[in-house]
Regions:
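Residue(s) in the substrate-gating loop at a strand-loop-helix junction
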Residues: 136
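Rossmann-fold cofactor-recognition segment
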Residues: 43-56
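C-terminal helical subdomain
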Residues: 178, 186, 197-245
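N-terminal Rossmann NAD(P)H-binding glycine-rich loop of SDR-like oxidoreductase domains
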Residues: 15, 19-23
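Active-site helix of classical SDR
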Residues: 115, 152
Length: 245
């Protein structure tokens, strides 16, 4: 009997929105799925309970990466870092400091630290490796009322470009890419649409897009993201979903 391929998949924020859609559309049978989130509850997934806005939770994720990878010889290992938050929306000089700090820790610091942990856990491993960072069009365009979110996504894109250069010197190395998923019909998008146009002017455009049915379905976007694993993309690529559909 031919043994089954061992496939390990981690998705941060798999309990809702795009993360839940990614978990529901995994294109592999018998994959070991791990949901990194506060709530958990993702069907078919094991759960690492982690509030990624709290740095004390990051070592828990690092430990899980290492234990699962070292427990066997995986042929394919994937980490999709999707977790993020818009809260607090509003001008940087007016929003709550505690919420703003959590935003920076989750959107900026956690992404880079967990990316590092994943790469470190795989260092020297002879298997197919993919790290996908979910970015945003906000990385390229400033949106009033979303300063820390915009800065975080821009930082993630530059991190991917830089780490991609580093991974080209590794054999086999990890393919590291960033993808902006576009405007999706999720609870996070609803939060943005519900914000005041005085504080977040772009919210009006998204309300119009919803009225016109122009917001993408999470499942469709998720399937496109999964298709990136089979595409001939260079490590360090920074993409928009419209460029690959």
């Amino acid at each position: 009997m031919i043994p089954l391929r061992r496939i390990l998949i981690w998705i941060s924020g798999a309990s809702a929105g795009l993360g839940a859609a990614l978990a529901a559309t995994i294109p592999f049978e018998n994959a070991e799925l791990v949901d990194i989130s506060r709530r958990g509850g993702t069907p078919g997934a094991q759960h690492v309970a982690a509030d990624l806005a709290d740095p004390e939770s990051w070592p828990l994720v690092d430990k899980d990466f290492r234990q699962r990878i070292e427990a066997g010889d995986p042929e394919l290992v994937v980490f999709i870092h999707n977790a993020g938050t818009l809260t607090p929306l509003g001008s940087a000089d007016r929003v709550d400091t505690q919420q703003y700090t959590r935003n920076v820790l989750l959107n900026s610091a956690a992404a880079l630290v967990l990316g590092h942990s994943f790469l470190s856990a795989l260092s020297g491993r002879n298997c197919e490796q993919h790290l996908i960072m979910v970015s945003s069009g906000a990385a390229m365009r400033p949106h009033e009322g979303e300063a820390s979110y915009c800065a975080a996504k821009a930082g993630i894109d530059q991190w991917v470009r830089t780490v991609g250069l580093e991974q080209r010197h590794r054999s086999p190395g990890c393919r590291v890419i960033s993808v902006s998923p576009g405007s999706i019909d999720t609870d996070m998008q609803a939060e943005l649409r519900a914000s005041s146009p005085d504080e977040v002017p772009v919210s009006q455009r998204f309300r119009e897009m919803e009225a016109l049915g122009q917001l993408a379905k999470p499942e469709i976007v998720a399937r496109t993201i999964w298709s990136l694993l089979d595409r001939d993309l260079e490590t360090g690529a920074v993409l928009h979903i419209r460029d690959v559909t």
